[in-house]
A protein has these predicted regions:
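Conserved beta-strand-loop-alpha-helix hinge in the C-terminal portion
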Residues: 205, 213-230
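ABC family nucleotide-binding domain
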Residues: 2-208
């Protein structure tokens, strides 16, 4: 379980302090898709950076299974990112000279699971595209490769920053379905930052941010599954 306790984050801009997050509290459970919504500038990306160990809060505590992440030294924080967290971004960051399989294999080898690379691509529906290079793939296919690459780390926490932001609505729903399936069938907690309010129907927990503060937290007892109508 991930727990945010009174998290605040300030940035020094010129002679002033800008508060990106203010007294934020929430919990993230495994087997859940958590959707974080909010307008631009609401603090979504800052929150995701702190969750992923890429930034430290100014105040407050973040814990993972009772381990105080914000109190880790730099070496241990790097280990936390490598062993616990997988990242999926809006832009795919694939290595253009490598095939889909090779892009995933790099991450798998770093985590001693290189023999499972094909399985990760199969899990996102790319068994027929493993030997294609990124320039031979559509945007949605490249995003699926990036998800498979993140899964190759066997993360306990999968952080997705606007993963459908560059995709059309049909492809976006396919990506959402993959993320929902990961949350439902593995021990991984999936957190997705998005500006798309339509996605809140599909999350187990919906966190709304506004001006760096929690506006609301709502749980869906029966979230809509991708492919269903409601």
């Amino acid at each position: 379980m991930i727990k945010f306790s009174n998290i605040s984050k300030e940035y020094h801009v010129g002679t002033q302090f800008v508060k990106a997050l203010n007294q934020v509290n929430f919990e993230i459970e495994p087997h859940q898709l958590t959707v974080i919504l909010g307008p631009s500038g609401s603090g979504k990306s800052t929150l995701l950076n702190i969750l992923g160990g890429m930034g430290r809060p100014t105040k407050g505590d973040i814990s993972f299974n009772d381990q105080q992440v914000n109190k880790l030294n730099d070496h241990d924080l790097t280990s936390y990112r490598r062993k616990v967290v997988g990242f999926v971004f809006q832009f795919y960051n694939l290595i253009p000279s490598l095939t889909a399989l090779e892009n995933v294999a790099i991450a798998a080898q770093l985590n001693n699971n290189d023999d499972l690379s094909e399985n990760y691509l199969k899990s996102v529906g790319l068994e027929e595209r493993m030997n294609n290079f990124p320039n031979q793939l559509s945007g949605g296919e490249m995003q699926r490769v990036s998800i498979a690459r993140a899964l190759a780390k066997k993360p306990k926490l999968l952080l997705c920053d606007e993963p459908t932001g560059a995709l059309d609505s049909t492809t976006s729903m396919k990506i959402l379905g993959i993320l929902q399936n990961i949350a439902n069938t593995t021990d991984t907690a999936v957190v997705m930052v998005t500006h798309n309010p339509e996605f809140e129907r599909y999350g187990n927990r919906i966190i709304r941010l506004k001006d760096g503060e929690i506006e609301s937290i709502n749980d869906n007892e029966q979230p809509l599954l991708v492919g269903e109508t409601g």
